[in-house]
């Protein structure tokens, strides 16, 4: 889990566009965040396996 202060800081608008960065909405993780879902890869995988993300299915070929 991310520190509460860092999560609060990321929610504030950045002064400059280059300072903006994405964080996971669920856990606050700053790395490997999918912009479309606003989730990190760990949380995305958990929710996808539970079937809580509509339209996401496990790949099979």
Curated annotation (Swiss-Prot):
Source organism superkingdom: Bacteria
Q: What Gene Ontology terms describe where this protein resides (cellular component)?
A: small ribosomal subunit
This protein's cofactor list reads: Zn(2+)
Where do the annotations place Zn(2+) binding?
24, 27, 40, 43
Q: Which UniProt keywords apply?
A: Metal-binding, Ribonucleoprotein, Ribosomal protein, RNA-binding, rRNA-binding, Zinc
* Annotated coiled-coil segments of the chain: none
Report the Pfam families cross-referenced here.
Ribosomal_S14
User: Which protein family is named in the record?
Assistant: Belongs to the universal ribosomal protein uS14 family. Zinc-binding uS14 subfamily.
Q: What is this protein called?
A: Small ribosomal subunit protein uS14
